[in-house]
Amino acid sequence: MKLSKQDSDLFFDLWFSLLDYTNKKYGIDTSTKIINRKTGVNLTSAFRISDKIWEDTSVIDDYLAENELPEDEQKILKSWHYRIKGTFVIERHLKKGAVIIDNEDNVYIVKGLTQSIRDLTCDFPTPVYIKGTLLPFKNVIITDGLIMPYNVIIGGNMRAELKELYMEAKRNDWIIEKMNIDLLDENRHLLKFFKSDISNLSEKTIDNHMKIVQWYLIYYLANQDLRMQDGLNCLDDFFNREVSGSPNEIKKICTSIKKFYKSMAEHNKISEDDYKSLCSEIKENFPRWAEECNL
Protein backbone atom coordinates (compact mmCIF):
# COMPACT_ATOMS: atom_id res chain seq x y z
CA MET A 1 0.00 0.00 0.00
CA LYS A 2 3.06 2.27 0.07
CA LEU A 3 6.33 2.71 -1.78
CA SER A 4 9.50 0.92 -0.75
CA LYS A 5 11.92 3.02 1.30
CA GLN A 6 14.23 3.29 -1.70
CA ASP A 7 11.44 4.57 -3.93
CA SER A 8 9.99 6.94 -1.31
CA ASP A 9 13.48 8.39 -0.73
CA LEU A 10 13.85 8.93 -4.47
CA PHE A 11 10.43 10.56 -4.71
CA PHE A 12 11.12 13.02 -1.90
CA ASP A 13 14.58 13.88 -3.24
CA LEU A 14 13.01 14.82 -6.58
CA TRP A 15 9.91 16.44 -5.11
CA PHE A 16 11.65 18.65 -2.55
CA SER A 17 14.22 19.74 -5.14
CA LEU A 18 11.42 20.70 -7.56
CA LEU A 19 9.54 22.54 -4.79
CA ASP A 20 12.72 24.44 -3.88
CA TYR A 21 13.40 25.39 -7.52
CA THR A 22 9.81 26.54 -8.12
CA ASN A 23 9.71 28.56 -4.91
CA LYS A 24 12.92 30.39 -5.78
CA LYS A 25 11.94 30.93 -9.42
CA TYR A 26 8.58 32.51 -8.59
CA GLY A 27 9.21 33.89 -5.08
CA ILE A 28 6.15 32.14 -3.68
CA ASP A 29 7.32 31.97 -0.04
CA THR A 30 10.26 34.31 0.47
CA SER A 31 10.54 33.32 4.14
CA THR A 32 11.52 29.78 3.09
CA LYS A 33 15.16 29.89 2.03
CA ILE A 34 15.70 26.25 1.10
CA ILE A 35 13.61 23.10 0.76
CA ASN A 36 15.21 19.67 0.96
CA ARG A 37 14.87 16.34 2.78
CA LYS A 38 16.53 17.77 5.91
CA THR A 39 14.71 21.09 6.18
CA GLY A 40 11.34 19.92 4.88
CA VAL A 41 8.65 22.52 4.20
CA ASN A 42 5.54 23.62 6.07
CA LEU A 43 2.22 22.44 4.66
CA THR A 44 0.90 25.88 3.78
CA SER A 45 3.94 26.66 1.65
CA ALA A 46 3.95 23.18 0.14
CA PHE A 47 0.35 23.56 -1.02
CA ARG A 48 1.03 27.01 -2.51
CA ILE A 49 4.16 25.91 -4.35
CA SER A 50 2.64 22.66 -5.59
CA ASP A 51 -0.38 24.57 -6.91
CA LYS A 52 2.02 26.63 -9.03
CA ILE A 53 3.73 23.49 -10.37
CA TRP A 54 0.50 21.69 -11.30
CA GLU A 55 -1.05 24.86 -12.73
CA ASP A 56 1.69 25.01 -15.38
CA THR A 57 4.04 22.03 -15.52
CA SER A 58 6.41 23.82 -17.89
CA VAL A 59 8.37 24.62 -14.71
CA ILE A 60 9.40 20.95 -14.74
CA ASP A 61 11.05 21.46 -18.15
CA ASP A 62 12.78 24.60 -16.83
CA TYR A 63 14.06 22.64 -13.85
CA LEU A 64 15.38 19.83 -16.04
CA ALA A 65 17.09 22.30 -18.37
CA GLU A 66 19.03 23.77 -15.44
CA ASN A 67 19.83 20.56 -13.55
CA GLU A 68 21.73 17.50 -14.77
CA LEU A 69 19.95 14.37 -13.60
CA PRO A 70 20.25 10.66 -14.45
CA GLU A 71 17.99 9.56 -17.28
CA ASP A 72 15.69 7.52 -15.02
CA GLU A 73 15.11 10.53 -12.76
CA GLN A 74 14.45 12.78 -15.75
CA LYS A 75 11.86 10.29 -16.98
CA ILE A 76 10.05 10.35 -13.62
CA LEU A 77 9.91 14.15 -13.57
CA LYS A 78 8.79 14.35 -17.20
CA SER A 79 6.01 11.89 -16.42
CA TRP A 80 4.55 14.39 -13.96
CA HIS A 81 3.29 16.44 -16.87
CA TYR A 82 0.48 13.87 -16.77
CA ARG A 83 -0.58 14.67 -13.22
CA ILE A 84 -4.29 14.46 -12.46
CA LYS A 85 -5.30 17.26 -10.10
CA GLY A 86 -8.77 17.69 -8.66
CA THR A 87 -11.36 16.31 -6.28
CA PHE A 88 -11.56 12.55 -5.85
CA VAL A 89 -13.28 9.95 -3.71
CA ILE A 90 -11.43 7.25 -1.80
CA GLU A 91 -13.96 4.44 -2.18
CA ARG A 92 -12.10 1.77 -0.20
CA HIS A 93 -8.66 0.53 0.76
CA LEU A 94 -7.03 -2.64 -0.59
CA LYS A 95 -3.73 -4.33 0.22
CA LYS A 96 -2.19 -2.94 -2.96
CA GLY A 97 -3.44 0.63 -2.45
CA ALA A 98 -6.39 2.99 -2.14
CA VAL A 99 -9.25 2.77 -4.63
CA ILE A 100 -9.66 6.36 -5.83
CA ILE A 101 -12.36 7.56 -8.24
CA ASP A 102 -12.11 10.83 -10.20
CA ASN A 103 -14.82 13.13 -11.55
CA GLU A 104 -14.86 11.21 -14.85
CA ASP A 105 -15.61 7.93 -13.00
CA ASN A 106 -12.13 6.56 -13.72
CA VAL A 107 -11.00 4.15 -10.99
CA TYR A 108 -7.37 4.12 -9.84
CA ILE A 109 -5.24 2.11 -7.42
CA VAL A 110 -3.01 4.61 -5.63
CA LYS A 111 -0.09 3.83 -3.32
CA GLY A 112 1.05 5.89 -0.35
CA LEU A 113 4.53 7.37 0.00
CA THR A 114 6.02 6.62 3.43
CA GLN A 115 2.69 5.48 4.84
CA SER A 116 -0.43 4.05 3.27
CA ILE A 117 -3.26 6.35 2.24
CA ARG A 118 -5.41 4.38 4.70
CA ASP A 119 -3.13 5.54 7.55
CA LEU A 120 -2.89 9.06 6.14
CA THR A 121 -6.69 9.45 6.15
CA CYS A 122 -7.46 7.23 9.15
CA ASP A 123 -9.70 9.88 10.76
CA PHE A 124 -12.03 9.77 7.75
CA PRO A 125 -14.01 6.56 7.09
CA THR A 126 -14.50 5.60 3.46
CA PRO A 127 -15.88 6.68 1.15
CA VAL A 128 -14.35 10.13 1.63
CA TYR A 129 -13.89 13.11 -0.67
CA ILE A 130 -10.34 14.40 -1.03
CA LYS A 131 -8.55 17.16 -2.88
CA GLY A 132 -5.21 16.10 -4.30
CA THR A 133 -2.95 15.29 -7.23
CA LEU A 134 -2.27 11.84 -8.68
CA LEU A 135 1.15 11.22 -10.21
CA PRO A 136 2.74 8.44 -12.24
CA PHE A 137 5.81 7.02 -10.53
CA LYS A 138 7.66 4.17 -12.23
CA ASN A 139 5.01 1.44 -12.62
CA VAL A 140 2.51 2.70 -10.05
CA ILE A 141 0.37 5.74 -9.26
CA ILE A 142 1.00 7.87 -6.17
CA THR A 143 0.04 11.33 -4.88
CA ASP A 144 2.29 14.32 -4.27
CA GLY A 145 1.72 13.73 -0.55
CA LEU A 146 -0.61 16.70 -0.22
CA ILE A 147 -4.03 15.17 0.35
CA MET A 148 -6.83 17.24 1.85
CA PRO A 149 -9.84 15.17 3.02
CA TYR A 150 -13.26 16.85 3.16
CA ASN A 151 -15.37 16.30 6.26
CA VAL A 152 -18.51 15.66 4.21
CA ILE A 153 -21.00 12.87 4.88
CA ILE A 154 -21.67 10.74 1.79
CA GLY A 155 -25.22 9.40 1.74
CA GLY A 156 -26.37 5.85 1.14
CA ASN A 157 -27.34 6.32 -2.51
CA MET A 158 -24.00 7.90 -3.37
CA ARG A 159 -22.12 5.19 -1.47
CA ALA A 160 -23.96 2.55 -3.50
CA GLU A 161 -23.16 4.35 -6.78
CA LEU A 162 -19.47 4.59 -5.88
CA LYS A 163 -19.36 0.92 -4.94
CA GLU A 164 -20.94 -0.02 -8.27
CA LEU A 165 -18.39 2.12 -10.14
CA TYR A 166 -15.60 0.18 -8.46
CA MET A 167 -17.25 -3.21 -9.00
CA GLU A 168 -17.92 -2.44 -12.68
CA ALA A 169 -14.32 -1.35 -13.20
CA LYS A 170 -13.14 -4.53 -11.48
CA ARG A 171 -15.40 -6.77 -13.58
CA ASN A 172 -14.27 -5.16 -16.84
CA ASP A 173 -10.59 -4.78 -15.96
CA TRP A 174 -10.86 -1.00 -16.18
CA ILE A 175 -8.97 -0.22 -12.97
CA ILE A 176 -5.95 1.97 -13.68
CA GLU A 177 -2.84 0.94 -11.74
CA LYS A 178 -0.17 2.64 -13.84
CA MET A 179 0.19 5.21 -16.61
CA ASN A 180 1.83 4.27 -19.91
CA ILE A 181 4.30 7.16 -20.06
CA ASP A 182 5.76 6.31 -23.48
CA LEU A 183 2.26 6.33 -24.92
CA LEU A 184 1.38 9.54 -23.07
CA ASP A 185 4.52 11.18 -24.49
CA GLU A 186 3.50 10.11 -27.97
CA ASN A 187 0.04 11.61 -27.43
CA ARG A 188 1.55 14.82 -26.08
CA HIS A 189 3.40 15.31 -29.39
CA LEU A 190 0.20 14.63 -31.34
CA LEU A 191 -1.63 17.24 -29.27
CA LYS A 192 1.05 19.79 -30.17
CA PHE A 193 0.47 19.11 -33.89
CA PHE A 194 -3.27 19.49 -33.39
CA LYS A 195 -3.03 22.71 -31.38
CA SER A 196 -0.80 24.24 -34.04
CA ASP A 197 -3.29 23.29 -36.76
CA ILE A 198 -6.22 25.00 -34.98
CA SER A 199 -4.26 28.07 -33.90
CA ASN A 200 -6.38 30.31 -36.15
CA LEU A 201 -9.46 29.68 -33.97
CA SER A 202 -10.45 31.69 -30.90
CA GLU A 203 -8.71 30.95 -27.61
CA LYS A 204 -11.93 29.60 -26.09
CA THR A 205 -12.59 27.31 -29.07
CA ILE A 206 -9.02 26.01 -29.02
CA ASP A 207 -9.32 25.30 -25.31
CA ASN A 208 -12.59 23.39 -25.80
CA HIS A 209 -11.16 21.28 -28.64
CA MET A 210 -7.99 20.53 -26.67
CA LYS A 211 -9.90 19.44 -23.55
CA ILE A 212 -12.07 17.03 -25.54
CA VAL A 213 -9.19 15.53 -27.52
CA GLN A 214 -6.99 15.25 -24.43
CA TRP A 215 -9.81 13.42 -22.64
CA TYR A 216 -10.16 11.08 -25.62
CA LEU A 217 -6.43 10.43 -26.10
CA ILE A 218 -5.23 10.28 -22.51
CA TYR A 219 -8.12 9.34 -20.26
CA TYR A 220 -9.76 6.93 -22.68
CA LEU A 221 -7.22 5.51 -25.15
CA ALA A 222 -3.97 5.68 -23.17
CA ASN A 223 -5.61 4.25 -20.06
CA GLN A 224 -6.24 1.12 -22.12
CA ASP A 225 -2.75 1.16 -23.69
CA LEU A 226 -4.35 2.12 -27.01
CA ARG A 227 -2.67 4.39 -29.54
CA MET A 228 -4.25 7.16 -31.57
CA GLN A 229 -4.62 4.83 -34.57
CA ASP A 230 -6.50 2.30 -32.41
CA GLY A 231 -9.08 4.96 -31.66
CA LEU A 232 -10.32 4.73 -35.24
CA ASN A 233 -11.83 1.35 -34.37
CA CYS A 234 -13.40 2.06 -30.99
CA LEU A 235 -15.43 5.26 -31.32
CA ASP A 236 -18.64 3.40 -30.55
CA ASP A 237 -17.17 2.05 -27.31
CA PHE A 238 -15.95 5.54 -26.39
CA PHE A 239 -19.42 7.07 -26.74
CA ASN A 240 -21.14 4.13 -25.05
CA ARG A 241 -18.77 3.99 -22.10
CA GLU A 242 -17.46 7.49 -21.52
CA VAL A 243 -19.84 10.08 -22.90
CA SER A 244 -23.06 11.61 -21.62
CA GLY A 245 -24.67 14.92 -22.47
CA SER A 246 -27.12 16.75 -24.68
CA PRO A 247 -27.19 16.22 -28.47
CA ASN A 248 -25.43 19.57 -28.84
CA GLU A 249 -22.64 18.43 -26.50
CA ILE A 250 -22.30 15.14 -28.39
CA LYS A 251 -22.02 17.15 -31.62
CA LYS A 252 -19.18 19.22 -30.13
CA ILE A 253 -17.31 16.06 -29.13
CA CYS A 254 -17.74 14.60 -32.63
CA THR A 255 -16.52 17.86 -34.18
CA SER A 256 -13.38 17.92 -32.02
CA ILE A 257 -12.55 14.28 -32.77
CA LYS A 258 -13.06 14.85 -36.51
CA LYS A 259 -10.81 17.92 -36.44
CA PHE A 260 -8.15 15.97 -34.56
CA TYR A 261 -8.10 13.08 -37.01
CA LYS A 262 -8.13 15.50 -39.95
CA SER A 263 -4.99 17.03 -38.48
CA MET A 264 -3.46 13.55 -38.12
CA ALA A 265 -4.24 12.80 -41.78
CA GLU A 266 -2.62 16.06 -42.86
CA HIS A 267 0.51 15.09 -40.92
CA ASN A 268 0.44 11.59 -42.46
CA LYS A 269 -0.16 9.93 -39.10
CA ILE A 270 -3.20 8.18 -40.59
CA SER A 271 -4.32 7.73 -44.20
CA GLU A 272 -6.87 9.93 -45.94
CA ASP A 273 -9.07 6.84 -46.36
CA ASP A 274 -8.97 6.23 -42.60
CA TYR A 275 -10.10 9.80 -42.02
CA LYS A 276 -12.95 9.49 -44.51
CA SER A 277 -14.08 6.23 -42.86
CA LEU A 278 -14.10 7.98 -39.48
CA CYS A 279 -16.26 10.81 -40.85
CA SER A 280 -18.69 8.27 -42.31
CA GLU A 281 -18.90 6.39 -39.00
CA ILE A 282 -19.62 9.59 -37.08
CA LYS A 283 -22.28 10.65 -39.59
CA GLU A 284 -23.95 7.24 -39.45
CA ASN A 285 -23.88 6.82 -35.67
CA PHE A 286 -24.40 10.40 -34.45
CA PRO A 287 -28.22 10.12 -34.17
CA ARG A 288 -27.90 7.00 -31.99
CA TRP A 289 -25.10 8.45 -29.86
CA ALA A 290 -27.07 11.67 -29.38
CA GLU A 291 -30.07 9.67 -28.15
CA GLU A 292 -28.24 7.13 -25.99
CA CYS A 293 -25.88 9.65 -24.36
CA ASN A 294 -28.62 12.17 -23.55
CA LEU A 295 -28.97 11.12 -19.89
Mark where each language-model region is.
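Mixed-charge (acidic/basic) macromolecular-recognition segments
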Residues: V128-K131, L135-K211
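Flexible interdomain linker/hinge and immediately adjacent N-terminus
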Residues: Y275-L295
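Non-catalytic DNA-binding core/recognition domains of DNA-processing enzymes
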Residues: L201-E266
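Structural detector for short beta-strands of small beta-barrel domains
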Residues: K78-K96
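A structured, charge-rich N-terminal accessory region that forms the first stable segment of a protein
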Residues: M1-E71
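Short linear interaction motifs
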Residues: E66-I84, Y108-T114
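Short nucleic-acid-contacting surface segments enriched for D/E, G, S/T with interspersed K/R
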Residues: T114-T133
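OB-fold (S1/OB) nucleic-acid-binding surfaces
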Residues: E91-T114
